[in-house]
Structure formats: structure tokens, C-alpha cells
């Protein structure tokens, strides 16, 4: 089976993994693909004002309508947010991780659902208990956006289902080898 089809990851992400790239490099590529990089504030799927790759706060200020940043400023904000997400993984995950696994967890927990929802989650508990396969299964349960079931395509959030599959693939990268 084609690796892209099997894991749903882009050729660019797979190439980085194959080349032995670092977690920051993999996460940057993955988040660019999932979040985009918007220099003008926009509402995310839950109606929250965001900018760049999903930042809700810039320089201590909440993102507001019509906020505009340069690409260079977004690059700086994105690097700060990426580094915070990866630092969270380093502090809170107690099992050894590969670079793709760090990127997958950073995207899912601190970056997308937030630490407040991650800490009590089955995913977090299973992962730190050493049940990696169970943790990867639990990522796929997070498929609601603003109360909408994203498996229902007419809810216009099916990308969430795809993202969870991809985050699960990264988080479990290599455990079956």
C-alpha cells in the first residue's frame, strides 16, 4: 500500500521523516499544511479569532478582528508556539519518543486541543502508562468541533477527522517495526 494513502501524511512530511528530520522541522511542515499561515486574523472552526498558524495571543495581546501581521512576524510567532508545544511534550510525556512521535503529540495535545483538555484525556493517560497503541487509538476520538460531529461531512469539519488520523500516524510512527 502507498505510504501516503496508508498514513494520510503528505510527501513533504514523509520525506522529512525519511531524512531523519528533527521534531521542529516535522512539526513546522505538518502545521503549515494543517493550519496554513494567515497574516490577517480569522475565526477558527470554533469561532475564536486566530492568526498565523492558529495563534490566539500575540505579544501578550488577544488576537482581534482585522489584526494584520507581516509574514516575518508570523514566522516569529509560529516558532514561539511550536517551541512551546514541543517543550510541553518534553515536560509532560514520560515515555521515550522519536522525532515524528514528538511532532504528532505536539500537534494534537498542546497545539490543537490544549493542555487543559489533554491532561485528563484517555490519550494522555494511556501514553504515559506505556500503552502507545491505545493512545494512538484515543487520538481518533477527538473528532468534534464546536459540538459538531466531524465525521458527518455536511458539518464542514471533516478535516478534523483527517488531522486526527495523521496525528495518530505520527504519534505511533515506528512502533510496529
Curated annotation (Swiss-Prot):
<keyword id="KW-0378">Hydrolase</keyword>
<feature type="active site" description="Proton donor">
    <location>
        <position position="35"/>
    </location>
</feature>
<keyword id="KW-0081">Bacteriolytic enzyme</keyword>
<dbReference type="InterPro" id="IPR043688">
    <property type="entry name" value="SAR_endolysin-like"/>
</dbReference>
<keyword id="KW-0929">Antimicrobial</keyword>
<dbReference type="GO" id="GO:0003796">
    <property type="term" value="F:lysozyme activity"/>
</dbReference>
<dbReference type="GO" id="GO:0031640">
    <property type="term" value="P:killing of cells of another organism"/>
</dbReference>
<comment type="function">
    <text>Essential for lysis of bacterial cell wall, by showing cell wall hydrolyzing activity.</text>
</comment>
<dbReference type="InterPro" id="IPR034690">
    <property type="entry name" value="Endolysin_T4_type"/>
</dbReference>
<comment type="similarity">
    <text>Belongs to the glycosyl hydrolase 24 family.</text>
</comment>
<feature type="active site" description="Nucleophile">
    <location>
        <position position="44"/>
    </location>
</feature>
<keyword id="KW-0326">Glycosidase</keyword>
<dbReference type="InterPro" id="IPR002196">
    <property type="entry name" value="Glyco_hydro_24"/>
</dbReference>
<dbReference type="InterPro" id="IPR023346">
    <property type="entry name" value="Lysozyme-like_dom_sf"/>
</dbReference>
<dbReference type="Pfam" id="PF00959">
    <property type="entry name" value="Phage_lysozyme"/>
</dbReference>
<dbReference type="InterPro" id="IPR023347">
    <property type="entry name" value="Lysozyme_dom_sf"/>
</dbReference>
<dbReference type="GO" id="GO:0016998">
    <property type="term" value="P:cell wall macromolecule catabolic process"/>
</dbReference>
<protein>
    <recommendedName>
        <fullName>Probable prophage lysozyme</fullName>
        <ecNumber>3.2.1.17</ecNumber>
    </recommendedName>
</protein>
<dbReference type="GO" id="GO:0042742">
    <property type="term" value="P:defense response to bacterium"/>
</dbReference>
<dbReference type="GO" id="GO:0009253">
    <property type="term" value="P:peptidoglycan catabolic process"/>
</dbReference>
<dbReference type="InterPro" id="IPR051018">
    <property type="entry name" value="Bacteriophage_GH24"/>
</dbReference>
